[in-house]
Amino acid sequence: MKYMLMFCRDEGAGPSWEQMSPEAQAQLGGQIGRWHAENASRIIDKGHRLGASSMATTARHKEGGAIVTDGPFVEGKEVVSGYVIADVPDLDDALRLAKTFPACSTVEIRPLTDQP
């Protein structure tokens, strides 16, 4: 079964990647790299780290057209900062992967459907 693991961070808790020192980036990057290497057989798409939510643009479809605004689609402190796609036997295995991720305060797990 394929699952998307979305890595979420609390924007008010600690520095963002861009705010970290090069040394802190290297340390955390190494931990994340090891996590990817240890789980390479189960991760089928390494995904990407996403830019800060302050760089987001949102299109809201309304009657009569779309409204485009700067910023994320929800107001809140916790935002998606990256993702991977895992191919694992079941949700329990996806949870085991999520529990070992070395960064981010929350990992949201969603199954992928066969529908586009």
Question: Where are these predicted regions, by residue range?
Answer:
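Conserved, structured core segments of small domains
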Residues: 1-116
